[in-house]
Amino acid sequence: MKRLHQVFVCCFAILSLMLLYNTSQALLFDFEKADQINQWKDLAGKMEIKDGLFCSTSAAGGPLVSMIKDWKDEWSDYTITTKAQGLIGDGDWGIAFRVQDIANHYSWQFCNGSLMFITYVGGGRVESVIQGQGEVLEEWQEYKVDVKGNKFDLYFNGKLLKSVTHDALETGSVGTFSWINAGLVVGAHGGAALDDFNVEGKGIPSSKLSVESKNKLAVTWAGLKK
């Protein structure tokens, strides 16, 4: 019985180390600290951290595109997940990837009530609408994109809804995309709010937040904030 207990403890320790390793290879943003904004760059509009949320607050109207600053082109395969909620009708809200500039990026988002994969290449915009996925505002939803080379698996609320390939943009950072129409009055958290933004993939270094999660016995990041 004693040996069985030792084997159990050993297996538990190994499993814990594996969880720690997997957790460490990720950029994690819980937006609980205001200085996390310094790791992001606004390409259009203005994003702010308010009440532990990443919020699109620009009142000028138009797109709000923000990306992680210190992104390396060799990080080509990765998975992005984030919680998000739209706070206004007739707006955009979601995530962006392969972000090079305001005229060149991909996004997985709601736009005017429809869930879409949108490409911006050389300033030209092409929409691919996901049928049958209605927009729900002011409730937390989950976006996920699994990026492998030029193939993108697009998930929403845990379900794979579409797999697409696109060759135009081979590199670029990851971030957020939203849109607020000019003159629209928004609340304290703006047109959209995001939380628990996570990018995990080969070569991506651990962030400070993932180190903190190690001290919490490798509880998964999704379970840290509910």
Regions found by a protein language model. Give the residues of each.
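Bacterial N-terminal signal peptides
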Residues: V9-L20
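Extracellular carbohydrate-recognition regions
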Residues: T23-A44, K208-G223
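Secretory/extracellular carbohydrate-interaction modules
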Residues: A59-G123
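Flexible glycan-contacting loops in extracellular carbohydrate-active proteins
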Residues: V164-D195
